[in-house]
UniProtKB/Swiss-Prot annotation:
This protein's name: Lon protease
Single GO biological process annotation from the record: protein quality control for misfolded or incompletely synthesized proteins
Active site, per annotation: 668, 711
Subcellular location: Cytoplasm
Record keywords, A-Z: ATP-binding, Cytoplasm, Hydrolase, Nucleotide-binding, Protease, Serine protease, Stress response
Binding site residues for ATP: 346-353
């Protein structure tokens, strides 16, 4: 145990065998002076990291005291042996004195030499990269393993913490293990850094080479008198010559200025050129002249589509207003609130998408279709900001660029199929586009200049109105396309579908003919849809079979109702209301689905068992509540309705709505359920020609419902002749086509008692129908 002055080291770690210079400040100067005063000039060098002394230091001797080339006082000290720091003791001078016990070094373990061999090899690889051949020779000459390990104190890329860890490890095997791991990690980092440097160097060399080649190419073109490719000067001339709004021109000239300052090899130059090309391709002040002939516009719409009176009238109103404003010099181009947005809602196949092209033809405008089905990124509407690689303008800007005018007809197809994704809600981005009060200053993220959309006629199509977000629907004028009557389907098939499918099959009118009777039968018995897509597929099937026959028999083919089954097989649909309602407990209801209106049967039966109500057919909560209301109404009002009040007592009631795989919901089946239960209790079947729809209350009132037109069209297609609807839905009958109004007898009733009196067959005393008591015991 020796008493030595402490030499604190804050920016170095001294290991045994090392000699390092130490700059002298008052603290280190005091330690050096104290050591020199003892005669043996020994002191204890201790690393001091983050203000704390380590547990192990090095007994060192002072070899020289003098000044550095910078003039600062310094001393050279050499490490002798590791020593553990003991407690402080008093001593002469201002230095800190402590007791120090030298640490004995254990004998090297058996694997120490293997570690030393690996350490030499790794250090040789590191030093070869730096060209330190003399250091390599010195390491190879070291035979003492402890000396070899402690020589790592000279390595510059080891941190002070790592060197302190080496100092605190007296076992040479432990030190060599630490060094091998550190050198391996350093070599891996060096390889990565070298690869990065190589890639950067190759990239710079490639850029320099391309720059020199471009300069040479420019010189060669100049000598040959060839035109140079578009540069910043050319873009400036194009911008100044283009017919651009003043704010857009200013923004474009600013970008041209950036292009002039940017290097040709810079990626930013390419982005600026792409942006300028997009701006210059936009039809900023180009507008087509609208057709002012309302008669001609109506003729175009009628020629392309049968029916759809509401849509056609709205287009003609829009055109008439614009013509009147032109005549009175009120101005129609642009301006706040001057746009128009129509939403065409209806089942598939009714012609919503094709109607957009007809509207454009009728107005004399260009037409662009923007498909929105499945779009889930807000940037698809507003565009990507130019900070992103591969940024593009949004679909609205691209549609205007494609149209080549600022007043096209833009069809936003399948707007109800928009989806919310992690990149935002595209429906929310459409709010500004479709708001006539805002879209005169629409700003695309890519262009970042105001774009006037107020003169664009937007048409949006949707199958399910409820799927459109309410704020978006509020900005559109809703026009409902409920489907076609049978006469309209025949006209569409005769004038459009039949010629198109005949031409696709490679046939002529002389080779095959189809009568209107066949078209009517296909529409009524082979298809049951609101639109005409399945009708067109049926015609295509007929023409394909005729084409096959024509290869062996060139005789003309006439398809009539007698031979239609040869081409399409047996009819797929037939009136089934009479068969289904022939027994008590079955009523025919009307419903609206995503494919239009449809007929819905409600079946009721009762059985002995625990009293209660069983509901099947995948009914939603609202429909289940309607069934409960219907049953409660009959139980409380049975005697007033002429029904046995005890017929339902102690019985299990089962209510089923067929097509069990299809989910169903809504309140409009209320009176149908009451009628089915009343038919079950009374034993009087429902009249087969009747269909009905309406919500019911506990007091027996028939409340209004929606989708009346679609439901009545479905009743007409299904062969029903009489329909019951709530009295408050009577104004909806004005929307019915004249053909359907003539074919259907519509009863508007306010009380369910009147519904039962009208819909149930009269009681027949001679029939084998069950009375209430017989039913209760059946």
């Amino acid at each position: 145990m020796a008493t030595l002055p402490v030499l604190p080291l804050t920016d170095a770690v001294l290991l045994p065998g090392m000699a390092i210079p130490v700059t002298l400040d008052p603290t280190t100067q005091a330690a050096v002076d104290a050591a020199r005063a003892t005669g043996d000039q020994r002191l204890l060098a201790v690393p001091r990291l983050d203000g704390e002394y380590g547990p192990v230091g090095v007994v060192a001797t002072i070899e020289k005291v003098g000044r550095l080339p910078s003039g600062e006082p310094a001393a050279v000290v050499r490490g002798l042996a590791r020593a553990r720091i003991g407690s402080g003791v008093p001593g002469p001078g201002a230095a800190l004195w402590v007791e120090a016990a030298e640490l004995a070094e254990p004998a090297p373990a058996g694997r120490a030499r293997e570690l030393a061999r690996e350490y030499r090899a790794l250090m040789t690889s590191v030093l070869q990269q730096r060209g330190a051949w003399q250091v390599i020779d010195a390491i190879e000459r070291m035979t003492d393993l402890s000396e070899l390990a402690d020589s790592a104190g000279y390595v510059s890329w080891l941190s002070l913490a790592q060197k302190t860890e080496l100092l605190a490890a007296p076992d040479v095997t432990t030190r060599l293990e630490l060094l091998v791991g550190w050198v391996r990690a350093h070599l891996a980092e060096q390889e990565v850094a070298e690869q990065i440097n190589t890639d950067v160097r190759e990239g710079l060399e490639k850029s320099q080479r391309e720059f020199l080649l471009r300069q040479q190419l420019a010189t060669i073109r100049k000598e040959l008198g060839e035109d140079e490719p578009e540069g910043s000067a050319d873009y400036r001339a194009r911008v100044e010559a283009a017919d651009l709004p003043a704010p857009v021109r200013d923004a474009a000239l600013r970008e041209v200025g950036k292009l002039e300052r940017a290097s040709d090899a810079s990626p930013e130059a390419g982005w600026i050129r792409t942006w300028l090309d997009t701006v210059l391709e936009m039809p900023w002040n180009t507008r087509t002249e609208d057709n002012t002939d309302l008669v001609a516009a109506r003729a175009v719409l009628d020629a392309d589509h049968a029916g759809l009176t509401d849509v056609k009238d709205r287009i003609l109103e829009y055109l008439a207003v614009r013509n009147r404003r032109v005549e009175r010099n009120l101005g129609v181009v642009g301006g706040r609130g001057s746009g128009a947005v129509l939403a065409l809602a209806g089942p598939p196949g009714v012609g919503k998408t094709s109607l957009g092209e007809s509207v454009a033809r009728a107005l004399g405008r260009r037409f662009v279709r923007v498909s929105l089905g499945g779009v889930r990124d807000e940037a698809e509407i507003r565009g990507h900001r130019r900070t992103y690689v591969g940024a593009l303008p949004g679909r609205i800007v691209r549609a205007l660029r494609e149209a080549g005018s600022m007043n096209p007809v833009v069809l936003l197809d399948e707007v109800d199929k928009l989806a919310v994704g992690y990149s935002g809600d595209p429906a929310a981005a459409l709010l500004e586009v479709l708001d006539p009060a805002q879209n005169h200053t629409f700003r695309d993220h890519y262009l970042e200049v105001d774009l006037d959309l107020s003169d664009v006629l937007f048409l949006a199509t949707a199958n399910v109105v409820e799927a459109i977000p309410s704020p978006l629907l509020d900005r559109m004028e809703l026009v409902t396309l409920d489907g076609y009557t049978e006469d309209e389907k025949v006209a569409i098939a005769r004038d459009h579908l039949l010629p198109r499918q005949r031409e696709r099959a490679g046939l002529t009118a002389d080779e095959v003919t189809i009568s209107d009777g066949v078209l009517a039968r296909i529409a009524g018995e082979y298809t049951r849809e609101a639109g005409v897509r399945q009708l067109e597929r049926s015609l295509a099937k007929i023409f394909r079979k005729v084409a096959v026959t024509a290869t062996t028999d060139p005789a003309p083919v006439h398809v009539d109702t007698g031979n239609l089954h040869r081409y399409l097989g047996r009819p797929k649909f037939s009136p089934e209301s009479a068969e289904r309602t022939a027994v008590p407990g079955v009523a025919t209801g009307l419903a609206v689905t995503g494919a239009g209106g449809d007929v819905l049967f409600v079946e009721a039966t009762s059985m002995a068992g625990e009293p209660g109500l069983t509901l099947t057919g995948q009914l939603g909560d609202v429909m289940k509540e309607s069934a409960q209301i219907a049953l409660s109404y009959l139980r409380s009002n049975g005697r007033r309705l002429g029904l046995d009040p005890n017929a339902l007592a102690g019985r299990r009631i089962h209510l089923h709505v067929p097509a069990g795989a299809v989910p169903k919901d809504g309140p409009s089946a209320g009176i149908t359920m009451v009628t089915a239960l009343a038919s079950l209790v009374s034993g009087r079947p429902v009249r087969p020609e009747f269909g009905m729809t309406g919500e019911v209350t506990l007091s027996g009132r028939a409340l209004p419902i929606g989708g009346v037109k679609q439901k009545l069209l479905a009743a007409h297609r299904a062969g029903l002749t009489e329909v019951i609807i709530p009295q408050r839905n009577e104004p909806d009958l004005d929307d019915l086509p004249a053909e359907v109004r003539e074919a259907l007898t519509v009863h508007t009733l306010a009380d369910v008692a009147d519904v039962l009196a009208l819909a149930l067959r009269p009681a027949d005393l001679d029939a084998d129908s069950l009375d209430g008591e017989a039913l209760a015991t059946a």
